[in-house]
Amino acid sequence: MNIRGAPDLGQPSDDPNSGGERERIRQRMKMVIGQLEGILRELKEVAKELREVVSQIDKLTSDFDFELEPDDWTTATVSSTSSSDKAGVGGPFDLGHLDFMTADILSDSWEFCSFLDVSTPSDSVDGPEAPRPGTGPDYQLMNGGLPIPNGPRVETPDSSSEEAFSAGPAKGQVPQRTPGTRERVRFSDKVLYHALCCDDEEGDGEEGEEEEEGDLAPELPRVEPHTGPLKPSPAPYKTKRSPLTTRRLGPTLAPEQTRRVTRNSSTQTVSDKSTQTVLPYTATKQKAKGKN
């Protein structure tokens, strides 16, 4: 096919346009080859200049004596040597000409190894290291993170028990107890206490109400002496009030123990309230039956 798209019937192509394109392609190829030859000439000139610079550096540094100190030799410098340096008489492991295994070169490494030998005990010769006298185990109590050595101590209360409010162990306390058993019972008592009382902050108000109810309790039997058998006698109030009043008035108790007594007696105060609230309701009901 010719350029115009007509089929070629075997006639020789005498079109002048095809010859012109070939000439243009040849000229472009010659121009590219000329540019490449120019680039090669420039690279050769740059190489010559670099050689001259290196020779000048050698001349300038010929007066200096570069001697490496023994401490500067490391394993990295030995491993980074070329294959031509390694190919010696003794093979790649021949380091005699470097003097690498001398004591001066390995002074720092030997000192470091001796430091490790001193700091680290040997298992075969020294044996197990003896514990230092006067020191306990390194672990600490989980109760507040106090730096106290852990152990079977009686005066160490659990965080969930009410014994944490007291200053020390009571006189009648058991010397040895299993940790966890008594504290669980105390925790259940505290849950019952929270179920009966609204808040712990109302302890002062409950104490005031307890004193007022203690004064009003003996007057209830005088007003209504004909109540039924559900009415309690004044004796239980005296028995419940007497230890509390004696404990509060006792000068020998510590403030922490007083706080513990008030917290333990708060549940009794709630039970007294419940029994006292039932009494007037029962009395009015019986009066209504009497009127009918």
From Swiss-Prot:
Pfam families: DUF4589. One of its GO terms (biological process) is inhibitory postsynaptic potential. Residues 1-25, 120-292 are annotated as: Disordered. Keywords: Coiled coil, Synapse. The keyword Protease does not apply. Residues 180-192 have a biased composition (Basic and acidic residues). Residues 30-63 form a coiled coil. It is found in: Postsynaptic density. Residues 198-216 have a biased composition (Acidic residues). This is Inhibitory synaptic factor 1. It comes from Mus musculus (Mouse). The gene is Insyn1.
